[in-house]
């Protein structure tokens, strides 16, 4: 799973922060890594440096194998809060998406699984 993090011209690109975000993404989304080709993260300051309200935005786009991309957005007052909110959202969306594909009608059922008990 490839991870690309970018910022707009209004945010300073801090190497340590970017590295910590990459580590967090790899950790939280590890269970989906074999089903994703790429993650794109874009951080932006919509007010251009203003300090009022939730003007920092994080967009995470996940690219599942053989599926349409999935996008989430979160706005917050700090870069960390915007990122963590978006990470939580993408984790939930991917769990729902991949949970549905592996638990659909016609899938394996506990009723049809071989029993370990020999009577």
Positions of predicted regions on the chain:
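N-terminal, polar/charged subdomain of small-to-medium soluble alpha/beta proteins
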Residues: 1-119
């Amino acid at each position: 799973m490839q991870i690309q993090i970018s910022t707009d011209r209004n945010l300073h690109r801090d190497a340590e922060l970017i590295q910590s975000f990459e580590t967090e993404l790899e950790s939280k989304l590890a269970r989906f890594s074999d089903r994703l080709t790429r993650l794109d993260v874009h951080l932006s300051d919509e007010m251009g440096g203003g300090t009022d309200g939730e003007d920092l935005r994080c967009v995470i786009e996940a690219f599942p194998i053989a599926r349409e991309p999935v996008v989430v957005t979160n706005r917050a007052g700090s870069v960390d809060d915007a990122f963590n909110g978006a990470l939580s959202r993408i984790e939930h969306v991917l769990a729902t998406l991949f949970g549905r594909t592996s638990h659909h009608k016609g899938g394996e059922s506990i009723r049809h699984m071989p029993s370990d008990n020999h009577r």
